[in-house]
């Protein structure tokens, strides 16, 4: 009996250290911004399965948020009403513009009437942008992922649930570009997406989360009013709208882990 109690205590300690469920929640008046990429089944042996949230898991996550009374907003709505949102406001975001955002994620969002923002790379087809960050990531895995075509982007934009934002022309690593090239990535993508959806594009996501103060200023110059990073956390009541933090949702997270991330803002 003593042995069993000892084992249970050890397991409980390990669980508590891993998940820190006991930590107090970040004030629920502070909105949460979630970062997703794909909603699709995992690929055996694939490098980027952490970017792939299984549809059944995504359904559970959105269903739980809905049941808990979360208020879903787009990024522009988040900015426009900052400080006046109800408790438990959440902005779901997707990076890159994968086809599964329409085929798998959108029906779930529609089912729960949950709004989201999709940051689209303009030149997104057959492009292995993972090599722009790390040259050895040259497997072509992301290049082979089907992307949204322009008609589908417009369809999502007209759905009433989806805001389309920019993720540059080529998913560029802005840190490797000079001022002129960086500004072109920012402005051209904005203009082309606006021409496609016939709406202003005001929301932006820094590719790879790699950026400097120069890029913040260039994004403002290009006409964006808010931008998200990959820095994990929950912003304060008075945030820098051009450097908003997000909560990363991994394809390897359990629902329990996702709940804790929403509570604490990052992996415990």
Where do the protein language model's features map onto the residues?
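C-terminal active-site subregion of NodB/CE4 polysaccharide deacetylases
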Residues: 1-92, 100, 159, 176-268
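A short acidic, glycine-rich active-site loop
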Residues: 51-55, 138-147
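Acidic (Asp/Glu)-rich catalytic clusters
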Residues: 66, 107-113, 146-165, 220
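Surface-exposed cleft-lining segments at the edges of enzyme active sites
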Residues: 92, 131-144, 171-178
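Residue-level marker for buried hydrophobic side chains located in beta-strands
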Residues: 92-93, 164
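Short acidic, Gly/Ser-rich segments with clustered Asp/Glu that frequently serve as metal-coordination loops
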Residues: 97-103
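A short, conserved beta-to-alpha structural element at the edge of catalytic cores
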Residues: 113-135
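Histidine-centered catalytic micro-motifs
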Residues: 164-172
């Amino acid at each position: 009996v003593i042995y069993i109690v000892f084992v249970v205590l050890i397991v409980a300690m390990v669980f508590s250290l891993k998940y820190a469920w006991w930590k107090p929640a970040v004030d629920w008046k502070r909105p949460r911004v979630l970062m997703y990429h794909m909603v699709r089944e995992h690929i055996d042996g694939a490098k980027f399965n952490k970017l792939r949230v299984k549809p059944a898991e995504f359904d559970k996550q959105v269903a739980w948020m809905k049941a808990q009374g979360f208020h879903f907003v787009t990024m522009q709505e988040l900015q426009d009403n900052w400080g006046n949102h109800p408790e438990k406001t959440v902005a779901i975001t997707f990076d890159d513009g994968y086809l599964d955002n329409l085929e798998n994620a959108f029906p779930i969002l529609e089912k729960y009437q949950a709004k989201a923002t999709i940051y689209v790379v303009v030149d997104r087809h057959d492009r292995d942008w993972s090599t722009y960050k790390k040259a050895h990531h040259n497997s072509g895995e992301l290049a082979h992922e089907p992307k949204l075509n322009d008609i589908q982007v417009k369809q999502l934009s007209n759905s009433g649930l989806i805001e389309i934002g920019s993720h540059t022309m080529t998913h560029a690593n802005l840190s490797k570009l000079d001022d002129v090239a960086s500004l072109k990535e920012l402005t051209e993508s904005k203009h082309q997406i606006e021409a496609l959806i016939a709406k202003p594009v005001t929301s932006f996501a820094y590719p790879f989360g790699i950026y400097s103060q120069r890029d913040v200023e260039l994004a403002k110059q290009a006409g964006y009013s808010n931008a998200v990073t990959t820095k994990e956390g929950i912003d304060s009541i008075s945030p820098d709208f051009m450097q908003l933090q997000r909560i990363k949702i991994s394809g390897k997270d359990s629902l329990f882990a996702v709940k804790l991330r929403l509570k604490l803002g990052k992996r415990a």
